[in-house]
Amino acid sequence: IENEINSKTLTDNPHKIIFDVLTELKHNLSLLSYCLENKNCIDDVKSKSFSRSLKAIYILQSSLNMKAGGEIAENLFNLYDYCRTTIIKSFTKQDHEEIKKLIPIVSEILDGWKTIKN
């Protein structure tokens, strides 16, 4: 994610970067859920989807302007934090069910983000 984001910062606008990060988060959550459910998944793929999911959440939380964003920014921060803790707990327990529940949440944020004019 970092290399993609770093190369995009020179050409893309912030709206597009957040869109890409949300898309990447959704993809990696799906991949992580699949890997946790299917024990024959390669450990490297599982580990990378875990770490990329956490990096995406860090980027999303770091991008929030808490002062200007007010309650919306605070709610998003808390939602991202919920996702982060759920990912860590689920990865530790090797439980895909809770990860699956995060995908519609991220999808809803992504759908909302698509409606914002940049």
Please report, for each region that a protein language model flagged, where it lies by residue.
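Amphipathic, charged alpha-helical scaffolds that flank and support histidine-based chemistry
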Residues: I87-I103
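Amphipathic alpha-helix face/heptad-repeat signature
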Residues: P14, I18-L25, K46-R52, I72-L79, ...
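Short terminal interaction segments
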Residues: I1-D20, K101-N118
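Short, solvent-exposed, charged loop/turn and helix-capping segments
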Residues: I59-E74
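Alpha-helical segments in soluble extracytoplasmic regions
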Residues: Y34-L60
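Short, charged, low-complexity loops and linkers
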Residues: E2-H15, S33-N40, S62-M66
